[in-house]
Structures are given as structure tokens and as C-alpha cells.
Design a protein with these regions (language model features):
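Conserved internal helical-beta-strand scaffold that buttresses enzyme catalytic cores
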Residues: 1-218
Length: 218
């Protein structure tokens, strides 16, 4: 027990040159046993792993949200969960591949788009499989609930013939989102049931956008 208060040389680990076991345990419990779980030790690239660790452990990198920011996150979580609960109640047994348990994806995507707009990004291309796609369409791409519910009722209407008749959780959409006066065009690419098939398509689309926007700083 006396060893708990002996100084240990850390050489910068947990941002300290030295510390006691008691202090180390307190720090680790406060950082890794709180409301957020982190998983990054599986990353094979040591530079990426250290970057992630520094983002988690350094005080100056700690996430700090304003009250308005917290309200916006809560509002998006409520929208995401409410959407899933409604579909579960209204369309019992219908395939929808819900986002249940992963609703934090919605405010996370919103934040990425918002920060992107602040960084002068004009377009965002998204590729994803069908899990949570309907929620992203409704609450990030702002596809109307009416259109989504019509698709549940079997009324598939699409502007193009290429995707006409496809199931609702394969469809994509696009919209212009505005945050703090910055407009960002966001598009979600259609994807079949082959989960990762969309990945090279989105990479190619993003590369084409870079070419036509003369974006050479990539």
C-alpha cells in the first residue's frame, strides 16, 4: 500500500514527468471510466495511436461545449431516437436497419459538417451501408419524413430511373446545409446490400469533385 505514494518516472506519459500510482489510477479512471469509452489501441500505426491518445488525455484537447452546443446535441439525439421509435411502432416488423444504440452518429455528422463549413469546405460526400441510413437521410440530409414514410407504404418515387424501385434503405439524397452562415452541399451516395460496395464509388466521386473544383491542396 505504501508503494501507491512512491513517485514513478513517466517521461511524459499521461502528460507528466513523474507521478504516483494513486495519481495515475485517479487520472486513468477519470479519463477512461467516465461517460465516454475510447477504443484505439488496435490501431497499428503508432503515430495515429499517439495522436488519438493525446486527443483523449491532454487537458487542452478536452471537449468543451457551450450550453447552446449541448442543447443542439441533445436535440439531435432526441430527433434520432424519436425517429427510430416511431418507425418501430408504426411499421412493426418492416425492415429498416435502425440506428438504435448508435444515435450519437447524427450529432457527430452534424458537427463534422459544421466544422467543415468553418474550414471552407464546400461539399461533403458520404458513403455508408444500410444500418442507420434512414436516420441519416432524415436528420442529416433532411430528406422529408413524408417521402420516407411514403416509401414504407410502398410508394417509391425517385427523380431518376436508375434507382427507381430500389428498397428505401439503399437510396441516397443530397441537400444544402447551412451552419453559422457557411453553406455545405452534403450528399449520401446510393448503396446496395453489398456493404462496402459504395466505398470506391465515393472515393471516385470525391476525387472528381476535387478535380472540377481545382482543389490541389489534398
Amino acid at each position: 500500500k505504501n508503494d501507491y505514494d512512491k513517485k514513478i518516472i513517466l517521461n511524459g506519459v499521461i502528460n507528466k514527468e513523474s507521478s504516483t500510482i494513486r495519481e495515475i489510477l485517479k487520472f486513468l479512471r477519470g479519463t477512461y471510466c467516465g461517460p465516454i469509452g475510447y477504443e484505439y489501441m488496435h490501431i497499428s500505426n503508432p503515430t495515429e495511436r499517439v495522436w488519438f491518445r493525446d486527443r483523449v488525455e491532454k487537458d487542452e484537447n478536452a471537449l468543451k461545449f457551450t450550453n447552446n452546443g449541448k442543447y443542439a446535441i441533445l436535440n439531435k439525439l432526441i430527433q434520432a431516437e424519436g425517429f427510430e421509435k416511431y418507425l418501430h411502432t408504426k411499421y412493426v416488423g418492416t425492415k429498416r436497419f435502425g440506428l438504435d444504440g448508435g444515435e450519437s452518429l447524427i450529432p457527430a455528422l452534424e458537427q463534422i459538417i459544421k466544422i467543415g463549413g468553418q474550414s471552407k469546405i464546400k461539399e461533403v460526400k458520404i458513403g455508408m451501408s444500410h444500418r442507420g441510413r434512414l436516420n441519416v437521410l432524415a436528420n442529416v440530409l433532411q430528406k422529408s419524413y413524408k417521402r420516407i414514410f411514403n416509401e414504407f407504404a410502398g410508394e417509391i418515387s425517385n427523380d431518376g430511373e436508375d434507382t427507381a424501385g430500389d428498397v428505401k434503405y439503399h437510396l441516397g439524397a443530397s441537400s444544402d446545409r447551412e451552419f453559422d452562415g457557411n453553406s455545405v452541399h452534403v450528399s449520401l451516395t446510393d448503396n446496395p446490400s453489398h456493404l462496402e460496395a459504395v466505398n470506391p464509388v465515393v472515393l471516385g466521386q470525391a476525387r472528381a469533385k476535387q478535380f472540377y473544383h481545382k482543389d490541389k491542396e489534398r
